[in-house]
Amino acid sequence: MRFVTTPKATVLTGLSTVTLREWTSRRALIPADKPPRSKGSPASFTWQTILLLRVAATLRNRFHLELQPHRTLFASLKAGLRRTSFIALWDKTLALQGGDRWSLVEAAETLPLIDDAILIVLQPHLEALSVEFALPLPRVPAGQLELFPARPVDSTTSPLVGPSARKGNPDTVLLARGRSA
């Protein structure tokens, strides 16, 4: 499992160092995966915790929610994300239904909601995390995996061996290649 430290976590979440420390240590809304060893050392975070911090930042910044009353929701989400693969979250929307109830729904699915919910599209958050954590991007299902992927052939380049060398002529002529710096 790959971890990022506090400086990288601030970049990925868009939170200041002070806010990140407040949420993960002091108020313990979303605890760090590896707390700091000593004063001044950075905490470490997995992709699940960074995703959860991004969701919390969205709730605070876009919906102006107070986060402290939702500690049980964050704990439930963290446990659920631990059991869910990164790939399984692509094209999903997070539905927060109040209390500690939440669900993942297909982005294209029309949602027959029985109760009120806040919907958060996960796609932009996952795209940001996939680069930093070197996590896989979703592939279009093709039915069968390609053994040798197709590569474009450039017909404008000249061959490295002249035509006489192809015919078995002992006087092979190598054409000049351009040098690259």
Regions found by a protein language model. Give the residues of each.
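Short helix-start
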Residues: 32-58
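Polyanion-binding surface elements
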Residues: 1-26
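Residue-level "edge-of-site" marker
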Residues: 23, 36-37, 73
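A short, Lys/Arg-enriched interface patch at domain edges and termini
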Residues: 48-81
